[in-house]
């Protein structure tokens, strides 16, 4: 049975970045359910916008995005729609429009060969015994059993590692649904849509490489029905759909209290969305995935006496920032307050008409 210093479950932005940064310094194994290349297999449904905080992470790491990761067009504003109040406002935003699946595969491609990576793999079971973490996974057609001193859960909203560490922990979840359509709008745009009769989260749209993507986060029970209802309403705001090219869905976490941020225990650690590190006001998670990765890397390499305690303390600033997003979300999803803010015209950039 092979033994490693660190076993990473999941190679989204958080897991890939951690594997890359620990390479050559610790013996690392990493498991991921995505294929190594191509469009077959799992791909994460995502609007695919890289926020300024995530861009800063790449600046710190000295990385630049390859052209095949960047999507067309680049949009500098968000059209914010309040359906009930029939209000539309434009706010400046500095996002980079990306192809999320290509971005994830590029992040994986940066992992050095010294890391043992298993693509298209499935983690079947984890447990702790004799001060080691045991992992059973299936890859290349057969089951393997390894042990590790440290276990890292970078496995997203449905984190197996989080469920194992905190079996009684409950966090609000939504089903994120997206549909792709051929782009029909004369001017591509990015939008954020609020309709409290549909969801107490929000919906979105983005133009990307000749497609119009429409999606949102909805209650788990009847999300599809609510999604369809909102689509019908959006014709009043000049949204054009047509025939569906493809549909996607996944679970997304929605932290709503301080206790929703969990960092791990017993030499197991959670990073990115697995830890609840996702913005409640925008559902943006890549920047927090990268920030939590940097924090955990520092803790693992410095080897303080109590690693889990050190990681918990080191993420305090990040958790406070995310708690601020919870407060912001409550403001944005409060109909009266949102209506007042939008009617005030603060930060709104009106579009010139011919």
UniProtKB/Swiss-Prot annotation:
MF term (GO), any: FAD binding
Any matching Pfam family: FAD_binding_3
Induction: Induced by the two-component regulatory system CreC/CreB and by the signal autoinducer AI-2.
SUPFAM superfamilies per the UniProt record, alphabetical: FAD/NAD(P)-binding domain (SSF51905)
GO biological process: bacteriocin immunity
PANTHER family assigned to the protein according to its UniProt record, in alphabetical order: CONDITIONED MEDIUM FACTOR RECEPTOR 1, GERANYLGERANYL DIPHOSPHATE REDUCTASE
Family: Belongs to the CbrA family.
Miscellaneous comment as given in the Swiss-Prot or TrEMBL entry: Disruption of this gene leads to greater resistance to hydroxylamine and hypersensitivity to ofloxacin, 5,7-dichloro-8-hydroxyquinaldine (a lipophilic chelator) and 18-crown-6 ether (an ionophore).
Protein name: Protein CbrA
Primary gene name: cbrA
């Amino acid at each position: 049975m092979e033994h490693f210093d660190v076993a990473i479950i999941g190679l989204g932005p958080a897991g890939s970045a951690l594997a890359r940064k620990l390479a050559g310094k610790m013996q690392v194994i990493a498991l991921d359910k995505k294929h190594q290349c191509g469009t077959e297999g799992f791909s994460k449904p995502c609007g695919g916008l890289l926020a300024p905080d995530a861009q800063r992470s790449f600046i710190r790491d000295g990385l630049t995005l390859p052209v095949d990761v960047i999507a067309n067009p680049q949009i500098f504003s968000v059209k914010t729609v309040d359906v009930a109040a029939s209000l539309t406002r434009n706010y400046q935003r500095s996002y980079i429009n990306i192809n999320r699946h290509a971005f994830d595969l590029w992040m994986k491609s940066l992992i050095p060969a010294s890391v043992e990576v298993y693509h298209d793999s499935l983690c079947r079971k984890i447990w702790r015994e004799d001060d080691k973490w045991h992992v059973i996974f299936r890859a290349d057609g057969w089951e393997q059993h390894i042990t590790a001193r440290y276990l890292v859960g970078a496995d997203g909203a449905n984190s197996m590692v989080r469920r194992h560490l905190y079996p009684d922990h409950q966090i609000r979840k939504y089903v994120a649904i997206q549909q792709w359509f051929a782009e029909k709008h004369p001017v591509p745009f990015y939008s954020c849509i609020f309709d409290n009769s549909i969801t107490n989260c929000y919906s979105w749209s983005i133009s990307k490489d000749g497609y119009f993507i429409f999606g949102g986060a909805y209650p788990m029970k009847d999300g599809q029905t609510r999604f369809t209802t909102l689509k019908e309403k959006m014709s009043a705001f000049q949204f054009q759909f047509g025939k569906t090219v493809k549909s996607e869905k996944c679970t997304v976490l929605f932290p709503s209290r301080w206790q929703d941020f969990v960092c791990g225990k017993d030499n197991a650690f959670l990073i990115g969305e697995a830890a609840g590190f996702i913005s409640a006001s925008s559902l943006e998670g890549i920047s927090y995935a990268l920030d939590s990765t940097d924090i955990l890397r520092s803790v693992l390499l410095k080897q303080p006496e109590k690693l889990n305690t050190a990681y918990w303390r080191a993420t305090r600033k990040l958790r406070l920032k995310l708690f601020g997003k919870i407060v912001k979300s409550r403001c944005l999803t409060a109909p009266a307050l949102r209506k007042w803010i939008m009617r005030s015209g603060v930060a709104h950039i009106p579009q010139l008409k011919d």
